Swiss-Prot record:
Residues 868-1024 form the Integrase catalytic domain. This is Pro-Pol polyprotein. Pfam families: Integrase_H2C2, RNase_H, RT_RNaseH_2, rve, RVT_1, SH3_11, Spuma_A9PTase. Specific enzymatic cleavages in vivo by viral protease yield mature proteins. The protease is not cleaved off from Pol. Since cleavage efficiency is not optimal for all sites, long and active p65Pro-RT, p87Pro-RT-RNaseH and even some Pr125Pol are detected in infected cells. It comes from Simian foamy virus (isolate chimpanzee).
Length: 1146
């Protein structure tokens, strides 16, 4: 605009009122007549300087129009009747043509697009006209930035501000490119010179064209920034749902993040230093945590009304079958983007083509494939020189992992190099180069994948080989796969049976299938003839943990999944394994300075109190070149197993090998010991010598000693050699046979120590003929074989010393954890002493295994019946039913029951979330707000959001005790009624329940209660609803008669008294020892936790205990039992069941 024209009044509009505006070159903030700001809330205060002095004034954020163009700016109140405009709020009034550093060849890009487009000639000419019409939309200069006309984003930090970071050393070659970017952004107001307490380092990244991209390392800032709830959809999900029609277009928004303004209060967080001067961003910077989500949300919202459009960050995709429609919708997109203030780069855009590149893939009408650009990158890959280059190559390959069936196996050896790397160095071999080329060749020849059709069921074909699982996904009518999935089994999974490996693969396949199913059923085809029969797999054949089996079996109950047998699938087992052995080739024994042959043996111990007696044998020999024995040892080990003897023998040999200069070979005939030492020992050493259950290894001290020897002397080789072979079977047969003989000799050596009888004072007095209390005089007492015996009518019995009696009881009881009488009979076969029954009862009451396993012989008191609320809407009971079979996208039903009347409301939801609960309750609370809401302790009801919602409305939240549905009996009974009624109405069509919810709600609310003799509708409204079998007399009553009848009905409701307690019931008291029931005990696991103390009695049926984890918990006594022998039971964990100890430690 001519500067003289700025002196003229400008037409403006505020809140629908037209008035005049004046451009003021000296104004730093726009002034609006104060009458327009009376209803606005100030966002801050600022100091305003005028010719009359300085004054603090409120600042508002207002939207208004100048010359028909929308302006959003910070404003202050003015006593005048016109607007005073600040030049910074309307820069377009004096806008000059943009002049930046590098001009892009726009005409060349437009010609390329017109030449490549598949549009007919008529639409091609229309496209050419659009290029001219929307010239302001295209990027004319590199680093050109749009200006999104929205309220500026405010970057909020957490409790602590980020720490300023030092600038990295910058490559001198990058400085010219970065300086151009900074100069261009300063001209457009994207950057502003400003000092800040924060600093983020600049990290230039080279581009393929030789220039450098300006990137800032905002990791320190991002640590303090709360992540926004709305995040971008995964690219795989977008590719599965985009519309693939004949004509396709992709548009690239240039520098989209930099188009979004941020508030001045956020500038300081974005600061960086360049050439000794600090700059701050006035727009969303790249690298900021929430930039992609904020930008994408805005772009999606802008284009939501345009059909067949998909947005992913700065990439826009649209497709149509009709060329005329495609051009029409394309112009609509151009118009929206121009009005919004974005800039489009035609360099990367493709318009009206049959095949386009989107999210790194070639998008065709049938599916997607790898682009030529990606394949060229693969061909240019060279062997890596360090760990960083290897990780970069694997990242590139991983992008296309779903295009070949055995990708994970092919790259397994390359991933192993990362684990074995030493710092940044890797051991790259010629075999690795061949394997890398094999992967690249497979990807370059990979076929296109089919698109996922949302109206068809998803088909999964699953199979496995000994080392990996294979999965293919199809549309039900499709011939090409949607994608491949390959899973290499872990070290633990390699030990599974083939059935368990197949179930592991199926589990991995179904996790991915839940995203691909898009609400449709999933058909799983596998070599398993009957999935129901695998539940009967015997426990000895199960090598996986029980928790895995529980997870696998849950899929059988999922109504969305159907399992089928496909006899053609076993052919997949013939896919060759990609396996590289890590065991070095064997050397001849003459190449070692010493050879140790080891063996361990165990026999049944001659001592009846012990089970085994072990020994080990070691032979030290040398081949020089003839076999010569240097030394040999036969060592008894006492009460140990043969496995422990094998490990001890190898440990002994390793310690002796430390004194031998040069390489040493240790031979063992135990495959377990050799495999563990060569393959498992490095992992055990790294994880602290614990197994998969996080328990210490058996014989941990021996393994630690072996690991220490191998670290001190790495040239010790431990090798397995099969034992008990004929002479001359192998070069080590003679040494193995001698070691076995020495081990057997050691196992036959028994150390026998003669013990004197240990008699206490009581038995000593008895043998001296004195009368001792509890010992009948008529029997004869004597000493024989060091033991005191008594002749009784049932035979001769041993009287053990008092110190041994507890051990005898525990030994007899622990054999099978028998009850009182069975244990007493077992002991009475050999022993007798006074009060033997009393001692047995006392010791059994202290057995932790029985305490946490046996059922309670006490019953809890009678159920407390809570008082019925005095009037409707006083108390609501709420709960979720589900998951149900999917019906119109819904899986759950929120059930709300009025406590006084039993009136029920049903709300379908997609998930049992807090937001769904609040949304449903908001509808109901528009009628009346309850005083109390009772629920279980589900996540949807215990979140802080739900608590805040209830607090705002004065609602008290009440929760039932865990694992005690009786506390929410009213809603639980309604749940069972709803499920039963839905099942009856939906026979043969379980996915149609959504349409029947109103019918179910009407039926429940008009069903008579056998106890109360009224329906919930009558209790709430006083009359029948207009339904069949309704009492027609009540429908014609006046309102006064309705209220009178309703009062009579409610007054007639009586509160049934609490039933009397049974003779076996118990009542809790403070300080009492009780045991809590395990919520969902697995097979062969304890049913009760260890004893806990009652801290507080809330009511006769609810207490607060100090649970087994040390936390205070509210529990119903239905889930408790009193501990036997309150005074004689300790609460320490020394004798606690080892299973529970493991659970606590994990």
């Amino acid at each position: 605009m001519n500067p003289l024209q700025l002196l003229q009044p400008l037409p403006a509009e505020v809140k629908g009122t037209k008035l005049l505006a004046h451009w003021d070159s000296g104004a730093t903030i726009t002034c609006i007549p104060e009458s327009f700001l009376e209803d606005e809330q100030p966002i801050k205060q600022t100091l305003i300087k005028t010719i009359h002095g300085e004054k603090q004034q409120n600042v508002y954020y207002l939207t208004f129009k100048v010359k028909g163009r929308k302006v959003e700016a910070e404003v202050i109140a003015s006593p005048y009747e016109y607007i005073l405009l600040s030049p910074t709020d309307v820069p377009w009034l004096t806008q000059q043509p943009l002049q930046l550093t590098i001009l892009v060849p726009l005409q060349e890009y437009q010609d390329r697009i017109l030449n490549k487009t598949a549009l007919p000639e008529e639409q091609k000419q229309q496209l050419k006209a659009l290029f001219t019409k929307y010239d302001n939309l295209w990027q004319h200069w590199e680093n050109q930035v749009g200006h999104r006309k929205i309220r500026p984003h405010n970057i909020a930090t957490g409790d602590y501000p980020p720490r300023p970071q030092k600038q990295y050393p910058i490559n001198p070659k990058a400085k010219p490119s970065i300086q151009i970017v900074i100069d261009d952004l300063l001209k457009q107001g994207v950057l502003t010179p400003q000092n800040s307490t924060m600093n983020t380092p600049v990290y230039p990244v080279p581009k393929p064209d030789g220039r450098w991209r300006m990137v800032l390392d905002y990791r320190e800032v991002n640590k303090t920034i709360p992540l926004t709830a709305a995040q971008n959809q995964h690219s795989a999900g977008i590719l599965a749902t985009i519309v693939r029609q004949k004509y396709k277009t992709t548009l690239d928004l240039a520098n989209g993040f930099w188009a979004h303004p941020i508030t001045p209060d956020s500038y300081w967080l974005t600061a960086f230093t360049w050439q000794g001067k600090q700059y701050c961003w006035t727009r969303l910077p790249q690298g900021f945590l929430n930039s992609p989500a904020l930008f994408t949300a805005d772009a999606v919202d802008l284009l939501k009304e345009v059909p067949n459009v998909q947005v992913y960050v700065d990439d826009i995709y649209l497709s149509h079958d009709n060329p005329h429609e495609h051009i029409q919708q394309l112009e609509k997109v151009f118009q929206i983007l121009l009005q919004a203030g974005y800039v489009v780069s035609l360099k990367k855009s493709e318009i009206g083509q049959r095949t386009v590149e989107f999210l790194g893939f070639n998008i065709t009408k049938e599916g997607r494939g790898l682009t030529d650009t990606f394949k060229t990158k693969l061909l240019n890959v060279t062997p890596p020189k360090d760990l960083k280059q290897l990780q970069s190559i694997l990242g590139l390959l991983n992008f296309a992992r779903n295009f070949i069936p055995n990708f994970a196996e092919l790259v397994q050896t390359l991933y192993n190099l990362i684990a074995s790397s030493k710092g940044k160095y890797i051991e790259w071999t010629e075999d690795n180069t061949k394997q890398l080329n094999k992967v690249i060749e497979a990807l370059n020849t990979a076929s296109n994948l089919e698109e996922r059709l949302p109206d068809q069921r998803l088909v999964i074909k699953v199979n496995t080989s000994p080392s990996a699982g294979y999965v293919r996904y199809y549309n039900e009518s499709g011939k090409k796969p949607i994608m491949y999935l390959n899973y290499v089994f872990s070290k633990a999974e390699l030990k599974f049976s083939m059935l368990e490996k197949l179930l592991t693969t199926m589990h991995k396949a179904l996790i991915k299938a839940m995203d691909l199913a898009m609400g449709q059923e999933i058909l799983v085809y596998s070599p398993i003839v009957s999935m129901t029969k695998i539940q009967k797999t015997p426990l000895p054949e199960r090598k996986a943990l029980p928790i895995r089996w529980i997870t696998w079996m849950t899929y059988l109950e999922d109504p969305r999944i159907q399992f089928h047998y496909d006899k053609t699938l076993p052919e997949l087992k013939h896919i060759p394994d990609v396996y590289t052995s890590s065991i070095p080739p064997l050397k001849h024994p003459s190449q070692y300075e010493g050879v140790f042959c080891t063996d361990g043996s165990a026999i049944k111990s001659p001592d009846p109190t012990k089970s085994n007696n072990a020994g080990m044998g070691i032979v030290h020999a040398i081949y020089n070149p003839e076999y010569k024995i240097l030394n040999q040892w036969s060592i008894p080990l006492g009460h140990h197993t043969a496995q422990m003897a094998e490990i001890a023998a190898v440990e002994f040999a390793c310690k002796k090998a430390l004194k031998v200069p040069g390489p040493v070979l240790v031979i063992t005939d135990s495959f377990y010991v050799a495999e563990s030492a060569n393959k498992e020992l490095p992992y055990w050493k790294s994880n602290g010598f614990v197994n998969n259950k996080k328990e210490p290894l058996k014989h941990i001290s021996k393994w630690k000693s072996i690991a220490e020897c191998l670290s001190i002397k790495p040239d010790i080789t431990i090798q397995h050699e099969k034992g008990h072979q004929p002479i001359n079977t192998s070069i080590h047969t003679e040494g193995n046979a001698l070691a076995d003989k020495l081990a057997t000799q050691g196992s036959y050596v028994v150390n026998c120590n003669t013990k004197k009888p240990n008699l206490d004072a009581e038995l000593d007095q008895l043998l001296q003929g004195n009368n001792v209390k509890g010992y009948p005089k008529q029997y004869t007492y004597y000493l024989e074989d060091g033991k005191v015996k008594v002749s009784r009518p049932e035979g001769v019995k041993i009287i053990p010393p008092q110190s041994d009696r507890q051990k005898i009881v525990l030994q007899a009881h622990n054999l099978a954890h028998t009850g009182r009488e069975a244990t007493l009979l077992k002991i009475a076969n050999l022993y007798w002493w006074p009060n033997m029954r009393k001692d047995v009862v006392k010791q059994l009451g202290r057995c932790k295994q029985c305490l946490i396993t046996n059922a309670s012989n006490k019953t809890s008191g009678p159920i407390l019946r809570p008082d019925r609320p005095q009037k409707p809407f006083d108390k609501f009971f709420i709960d979720y039913i589900g998951p149900l079979p999917p019906s119109q996208g819904y899986l759950y039903v929120l059930v709300i029951v009025d406590g006084m009347t039993g009136f029920t409301w049903l709300y379908p939801t997609k998930a049992p979330s807090t937001s769904a609960t609040v949304k449903s309750l908001n509808v109901l609370t528009s009628i009346a707000i309850p005083k109390v809401i009772h629920s279980d302790q589900g996540a949807a009801f215990t979140s802080s959001t739900f608590a805040e919602w209830a607090k705002e409305r004065g609602i008290h939240l009440e929760f039932s005790t865990p694992y005690h549905p009786q506390s929410s009996g009213k809603v639980e009974r309604k749940n069972s009624d709803i499920k039963r009624l839905l099942t009856k109405l939906l026979v043969g069509r379980p996915t149609k329940w959504y349409d029947l919810l109103p019918v179910v709600q009407l039926a429940l609310n008009n069903t008579y209660s056998p106890v109360l003799k009224y329906t919930p509708h009558q209790l709430l409204f006083g009359i029948d609803s207009n339904t069949p079998f309704a009492n027609q007399d009540t429908l014609d009553l006046t309102r006064e008669e309705e209220l009178s009848l309703l009062q009579e009905i409610r007054a007639s409701l009586y509160q049934p008294s609490t039933p009397p307690a049974s003779s076996r019931s118990w009542s809790p008291v403070v300080g009492q020892l009780v045991q809590e029931r395990v919520a969902r005990p697995a097979s062969l696991r304890p049913r009760w936790h260890k004893p806990s103390t009652v801290l507080e009695v809330l009511n006769p049926r609810t207490v607060v205990i100090l649970d087994h984890l040390g936390n205070n918990r509210t529990v119903s006594i239905d889930n408790l039992k009193p501990t036997s022998h309150q005074n004689g039971t300790t609460n320490d964990t020394a004798t606690m069941d080892h299973l529970e100890q493991n659970e606590q430690s994990s």
